[in-house]
Swiss-Prot record:
Subunit relationships: Heterodimer of a B chain and an A chain linked by two disulfide bonds.
Species lineage: Eukaryota, Metazoa, Chordata, Craniata, Vertebrata
Cellular component GO terms held in the UniProt record: extracellular space
Species of the source: Katsuwonus pelamis
UniProt-recorded Gene Ontology molecular function terms: hormone activity
Family assignment from sequence similarity: Belongs to the insulin family.
Protein name per the record: Insulin-2
Amino acid sequence: AAPPQHLCGSHLVDALYLVCGERGFFYNPKGIVEQCCHKPCNIFDLQNYCN
């Protein structure tokens, strides 16, 4: 798995598209920005936001 990284703005949205694919994702900016932009997150954290 990829190492945890900081993902903000469009990078974060792009990562969600990659991880979630056709399932789509629930974009809750407050939660995910706190988890993935302010702090590094990994692919498993991102999967929690998939539909």
